[in-house]
């Protein structure tokens, strides 16, 4: 029975030794390159996901093309829908062009009318520039526009009084400004 016990006890010792060796090897490998292994696994997972999505899309496209070849009615319906959409878009564009042309026509008519009014007012001797807020008076009881002398700026109050200019030192005040001298600030021989 001693012989029967020896192989049994020797075998677990070999297994524990190999497990210990495996544990030490894997532990040192993870300690040295653990983050690299983790990031490469995550990157590999992301790449596999992206490729699987693209493969699914490619398969779906191939199936759609195969169905389109098998069903010509679907192709005809798609082409008709596309033509109808193009026609609607063209009609919308044509309507926008017509609106724009009408607006341009109205603007040209307004400009032409203003030029005619300006020409007429110049022929009558009036100023052709009208104030938009006040219409001009026609032959009013007051004096004619050619004999009235404009008042100028006498009605307006000056923004600054007294003619004081701080840059020149003119006009009231006890302090006057003079520009500084050029050259070094301290006196010395050069």
Swiss-Prot record:
<dbReference type="GO" id="GO:0002865">
    <property type="term" value="P:negative regulation of acute inflammatory response to antigenic stimulus"/>
</dbReference>
<dbReference type="InterPro" id="IPR009703">
    <property type="entry name" value="Selenoprotein_S"/>
</dbReference>
<keyword id="KW-0472">Membrane</keyword>
<feature type="region of interest" description="VCP/p97-interacting motif (VIM)">
    <location>
        <begin position="78"/>
        <end position="90"/>
    </location>
</feature>
<dbReference type="GO" id="GO:0032720">
    <property type="term" value="P:negative regulation of tumor necrosis factor production"/>
</dbReference>
<dbReference type="GO" id="GO:0034599">
    <property type="term" value="P:cellular response to oxidative stress"/>
</dbReference>
<dbReference type="GO" id="GO:0005789">
    <property type="term" value="C:endoplasmic reticulum membrane"/>
</dbReference>
<keyword id="KW-1133">Transmembrane helix</keyword>
<dbReference type="GO" id="GO:0030968">
    <property type="term" value="P:endoplasmic reticulum unfolded protein response"/>
</dbReference>
<dbReference type="GO" id="GO:1902236">
    <property type="term" value="P:negative regulation of endoplasmic reticulum stress-induced intrinsic apoptotic signaling pathway"/>
</dbReference>
<feature type="compositionally biased region" description="Gly residues">
    <location>
        <begin position="160"/>
        <end position="174"/>
    </location>
</feature>
<comment type="function">
    <text>Involved in the degradation process of misfolded endoplasmic reticulum (ER) luminal proteins. Participates in the transfer of misfolded proteins from the ER to the cytosol, where they are destroyed by the proteasome in a ubiquitin-dependent manner. Probably acts by serving as a linker between DERL1, which mediates the retrotranslocation of misfolded proteins into the cytosol, and the ATPase complex VCP, which mediates the translocation and ubiquitination.</text>
</comment>
<feature type="region of interest" description="Disordered">
    <location>
        <begin position="96"/>
        <end position="190"/>
    </location>
</feature>
<dbReference type="GO" id="GO:0036502">
    <property type="term" value="C:Derlin-1-VIMP complex"/>
</dbReference>
<dbReference type="GO" id="GO:0071222">
    <property type="term" value="P:cellular response to lipopolysaccharide"/>
</dbReference>
<dbReference type="GO" id="GO:0009749">
    <property type="term" value="P:response to glucose"/>
</dbReference>
<dbReference type="GO" id="GO:0045454">
    <property type="term" value="P:cell redox homeostasis"/>
</dbReference>
<dbReference type="GO" id="GO:0036503">
    <property type="term" value="P:ERAD pathway"/>
</dbReference>
<dbReference type="GO" id="GO:0051775">
    <property type="term" value="P:response to redox state"/>
</dbReference>
<keyword id="KW-0812">Transmembrane</keyword>
<comment type="subunit">
    <text>Interacts with DERL1 and (via VIM motif) with VCP, suggesting that it forms a membrane complex with DERL1 that serves as a receptor for VCP. Also interacts with DERL2, DERL3 and SELENOK. The SELENOK-SELENOS complex interacts with VCP. Interacts with CCDC47.</text>
</comment>
<dbReference type="GO" id="GO:0034362">
    <property type="term" value="C:low-density lipoprotein particle"/>
</dbReference>
<dbReference type="GO" id="GO:0030970">
    <property type="term" value="P:retrograde protein transport, ER to cytosol"/>
</dbReference>
<dbReference type="GO" id="GO:0016209">
    <property type="term" value="F:antioxidant activity"/>
</dbReference>
<dbReference type="GO" id="GO:0080164">
    <property type="term" value="P:regulation of nitric oxide metabolic process"/>
</dbReference>
<keyword id="KW-0256">Endoplasmic reticulum</keyword>
<dbReference type="GO" id="GO:0051117">
    <property type="term" value="F:ATPase binding"/>
</dbReference>
<comment type="similarity">
    <text>Belongs to the selenoprotein S family.</text>
</comment>
<dbReference type="Pfam" id="PF06936">
    <property type="entry name" value="Selenoprotein_S"/>
</dbReference>
<dbReference type="GO" id="GO:0005881">
    <property type="term" value="C:cytoplasmic microtubule"/>
</dbReference>
<dbReference type="GO" id="GO:0019899">
    <property type="term" value="F:enzyme binding"/>
</dbReference>
<keyword id="KW-0712">Selenocysteine</keyword>
<dbReference type="GO" id="GO:2000110">
    <property type="term" value="P:negative regulation of macrophage apoptotic process"/>
</dbReference>
<dbReference type="GO" id="GO:0034361">
    <property type="term" value="C:very-low-density lipoprotein particle"/>
</dbReference>
<protein>
    <recommendedName>
        <fullName>Selenoprotein S</fullName>
    </recommendedName>
</protein>
<dbReference type="GO" id="GO:0032715">
    <property type="term" value="P:negative regulation of interleukin-6 production"/>
</dbReference>
<feature type="compositionally biased region" description="Basic and acidic residues">
    <location>
        <begin position="97"/>
        <end position="118"/>
    </location>
</feature>
<feature type="transmembrane region" description="Helical">
    <location>
        <begin position="28"/>
        <end position="48"/>
    </location>
</feature>
<dbReference type="GO" id="GO:1990381">
    <property type="term" value="F:ubiquitin-specific protease binding"/>
</dbReference>
<keyword id="KW-0832">Ubl conjugation</keyword>
<keyword id="KW-0963">Cytoplasm</keyword>
<dbReference type="GO" id="GO:0036513">
    <property type="term" value="C:Derlin-1 retrotranslocation complex"/>
</dbReference>
């Amino acid at each position: 029975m001693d012989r029967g016990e020896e192989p049994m006890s020797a075998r677990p010792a070999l297994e524990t030794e190999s497990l210990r060796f495996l544990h030490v090897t894997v532990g040192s490998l993870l300690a040295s390159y653990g983050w690299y292994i983790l990031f490469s696994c995550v990157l590999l997972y992301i790449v596999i996901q992206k490729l699987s999505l693209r493969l699914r899309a490619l398969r779906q496209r191939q199936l759609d093309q195969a169905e389109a070849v098998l069903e010509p009615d679907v192709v005809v319906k798609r082409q008709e829908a596309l033509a109808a959409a193009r026609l609607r878009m063209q009609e919308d564009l044509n309507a926008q062009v017509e609106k724009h042309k009408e607006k341009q026509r109205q603007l040209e008519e307004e400009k032409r009318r203003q030029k005619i009014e300006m020409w007429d007012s110049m022929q009558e001797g009036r100023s052709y520039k009208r104030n938009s807020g006040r219409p001009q008076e026609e032959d009013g009881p007051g004096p004619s526009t050619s004999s009235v002398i404009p008042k100028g700026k006498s009605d307006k109050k000056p923004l600054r009084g007294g003619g004081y200019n701080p840059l020149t030192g003119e006009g009231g005040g006890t302090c006057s400004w003079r520009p500084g001298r050029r050259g070094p600030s301290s006196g010395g021989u050069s």
